[in-house]
Amino acid sequence: MTREQNKFISNERKLAFSDVYLVPQFSSINSRRSVNVTEEFTFKNGHSWEGTPIIASNMDYIGTLEMASSLQNFKICTAVSKFVSPEDWISHIESGLDMEYAFPTFGLDNKNYITDYLNHISDSTGHTAKIIVLDVPNGYIDSFASLISDLKVLIPDITIFAGNVVTPEGVELLANAGVDGVKLGIGSGSVCTTSIETGVGYPQLSAILDCADTAKNNNVVLISDGGISESGDLGKAF
């Protein structure tokens, strides 16, 4: 392999969750039932949130309002699919849906569409979204960063999670655009076809480890998105 070719190949070993185990350590907790997994976060926009830091994916048949209504009882979040209408949101909010744990999701949409969507829900119910998710297959494009920057001006009080990226450079790009949380993961989802169709991807555990310092230095949270095939993978992600 020539030096010119070698610059495109990483010599570092990259790991998925299935490549590792957690080494047992001493604990004063006598039962797994005694473990408290709730956390409190204060994002860089000043918004504080408390609950179980697990988010049901915004996939069509997972990120539903019905799922959100069930999971909120355990303070678990749901990124609600972008295909859900504002009217459906309004109906469920009036039935007790808590927007502290249910997050509207958008793609690379027009900024005015997003603000109109959120305002319609707020004006109709008196409840405002606390967190929104911006989700695209490739979070490295300029237009995505521009959308984030525009929204941070238009809706500064709303916490924004955005992605997906898998490298420190991607985390820094989105952090500089103004996000409060970065969604990490490309090609690692159990039903994701991105790696198969495009050849693009990154082993999920290494993505988390490689990006952690950059996220901390930029005061954003990392959200591991994908790669979970067994319940034990949750512990590895944390």
Task: Kindly give the residue locations of the regions a language model identified.
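Repeat-solenoid scaffold signature
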Residues: 216-238
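Active-site entrance/lid segments in N-terminal catalytic domains of soluble metabolic enzymes
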Residues: 1-221
